Amino acid sequence: MSFASETKKELTNLEMKECCEKAELSALLRMNGSLSFSNRRLSIDIQTENAAIARRIYTLLKKGYDVTVELLVRKKMRLKKNNVYIVRLVEKSREILADLHIVRDDFSFIRNISQELIEKKCCKRSYLRGAFLAGGSVNNPETSSYHLEIFSLYKEHNDAICELMNGFDLNSKTLERRKGYITYLKEAEKITEFLNIIGAHNALLRFEDIRIVRDMRNSVNRLVNCETANLNKTIGAALRQIENIRYIDETVGLDILPDKLQEIAQLRRDYQDVTLKELGEMVSGGKISKSGINHRLRKIDEIAEKLRAGETLVKK
């Protein structure tokens, strides 16, 4: 089961107040419902591929409106061939849609979220929970990027969801997609806040556990890569220094170097594996800092380059 499916399953087991049940059900019907007329009767089909969500819708309708509800199961014939669950409401359809502020008394469609549904903060959370159950998805935190989104068919509702989320300081953004619109979050901290808002506390803890391990692993990898790069740089510099010292020795002899450079050249040639700090401790006449040793080695490199360029050197 995917992380998103586990999150939704957890949400379908939450207990709610009556006002919150209405807010959640409104989002579910608005986003997953469709209307049909048969034998002069209006019916509502609420469709989902998640059995737990279908049970949730069925229970909320029975509990809130005491109506006859049918539950149908069909098999998709394309792609994954998953089961499709259809919760069918064949009585009081018009009254329920009006009560959930999805249609007006004249049966015209309401595209925004009614403020009456989300007056209380708990109802705002519940509407977002219903919207996530109906059209939401969230990436597994083990993947390369963090992403949570809620899909809506029309812009007004999508903008209303975005506004509702940003009322909780989530910094959500909207984007037009093929056949609809999405409100999305990209920051891991905002995704965990959203999971907390809608009541997915177990999913939140799992998300955070995986994220912490992942971020720690990435930090270790960055540290190792940095140390490896520094080590390669140090080894490369040491090999270059040794090669230049050998070139000077074979071309004109180390005696051509000033005494201080000659001593460093001989130490670097004889002790190729030691660090600059250790070289500084070997110098006669007192300890020299790493920067001091590095300065002398750069002078030796410059002399080697001058010799390669054909210049004649005289010991100073």
Curated annotation (Swiss-Prot):
- Keyword DNA-binding set for record: yes
Which keywords does this Swiss-Prot/TrEMBL entry list? Cell cycle, Cell division, DNA-binding
Annotated DNA-binding ranges come to: 275-309
Q: Name one Pfam family in it.
A: WhiA_N
Q: Which InterPro entries match?
A: Homing_endonucl, Sporu_reg_WhiA_N_dom, Sporulation_regulator_WhiA, Sporulation_regulator_WhiA_C, WhiA_LAGLIDADG_dom
Biological process per Gene Ontology, one example term = regulation of sporulation
What's an example of a GO molecular-function annotation for this chain? DNA binding
Q: Which SUPFAM superfamilies match?
A: Homing endonucleases (SSF55608)
Q: Where are the transmembrane segments?
A: none
Function as written in the Swiss-Prot or TrEMBL entry = Involved in cell division and chromosome segregation.
Q: Which HAMAP family match?
A: HTH_type_WhiA
Q: Which family does it belong to?
A: Belongs to the WhiA family.
Specify the protein name.
Answer: Probable cell division protein WhiA
Organism from which the protein derives: Bacillus cereus (strain ATCC 14579 / DSM 31 / CCUG 7414 / JCM 2152 / NBRC 15305 / NCIMB 9373 / NCTC 2599 / NRRL B-3711)
